[in-house]
Structures are given as structure tokens and as C-alpha cells.
Amino acid sequence: MPNIKSAKKRVKVSERNRLINKAYKTRMKNSIKKVLLALQEGKSREEVEQLYKVAQSAIDKAAKIGAIHKNQASRRKSRLIAKINKHFASKE
């Protein structure tokens, strides 16, 4: 337990930031799961791309506030679009 005033404040601030980061990461992961689920269910390319836009936005927002690193955001987006392209390339 911190005794110094600034240390007490840091505990509060870090807990608040942890919860904010957790919310952004959860939103990001859920949107990615929706895209992957749509691929498994065989949804149309338009529907999947619409879900991808939502996921891309969630990933970028998480990176913007620092919940994830910008390189991780880039990697997640590129891997997700690669899966989408691979899925629809095999269908054609």
C-alpha cells in the first residue's frame, strides 16, 4: 500500500487506465472474432468487408490510445485482411 501522496495517485490513475485499455482491447478482439465467424459461416464478401471496417476501426482506436502498439495494430489488420482474401480467393 503506497504511503506517499503521488504514489497513491499513480495507483488510481494506473487502475483507471487499465480499465480503459481493457475496454478498447475487448472491443477490438470481439470485432475481430465477428469477422472470423462471418468467414466460417460463409457470409458474402460485402458483409465480411463491412465487419472488417468495424474491426479495423477498433484496432486503430486501440493503437491510438496506446492500449496496443502501432506495429501490433498493423500486424493484426494485415493478417485479418490476408485471411479474408485467402478465403474468397479459394471460393473463386
UniProtKB/Swiss-Prot annotation:
Domain of life: Bacteria
Gene Ontology CC annotation, any one: small ribosomal subunit
Gene3D superfamilies named in the record: Ribosomal protein S20
Keywords, comma-separated and alphabetical: Ribonucleoprotein, Ribosomal protein, RNA-binding, rRNA-binding
A single GO molecular function term of this UniProt record: structural constituent of ribosome
General function of this protein: Binds directly to 16S ribosomal RNA.
Family as reported in the entry's similarity comment: Belongs to the bacterial ribosomal protein bS20 family.
Protein name as it appears in the record: Small ribosomal subunit protein bS20
Organism: Thermosipho africanus (strain TCF52B)
Species lineage: Bacteria, Thermotogati, Thermotogota, Thermotogae, Thermotogales
